[in-house]
């Protein structure tokens, strides 16, 4: 199932398919998020923002919903 990272449920593992080439997407690439990388939404604050995203096995990144919408992912486990 393909979706954007902002719509991915908490706890679901996913793989990054694409990242937008808009300035926000480029910033995410600079932070180390790349296509093919495993990610997981660890936490969504009340109201959905911010999100805590586990990126690979290396770090956790805090993102706004608007930023997470630039990342397209597909589920790797159901």
Specify the residue positions occupied by each region the protein language model found.
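Compact, glycine-rich, soluble single-domain proteins
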Residues: 1-78
């Amino acid at each position: 199932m393909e979706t954007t990272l902002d719509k991915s449920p908490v706890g679901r593992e996913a793989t990054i398919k694409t990242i937008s080439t808009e300035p926000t997407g480029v910033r995410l690439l600079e932070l180390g998020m790349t296509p093919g990388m495993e990610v997981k939404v660890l936490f969504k604050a009340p109201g959905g923002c911010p999100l805590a995203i586990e990126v690979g096995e290396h770090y956790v990144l805090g993102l706004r919903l608007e930023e997470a919408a630039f990342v397209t992912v597909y589920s790797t486990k159901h």
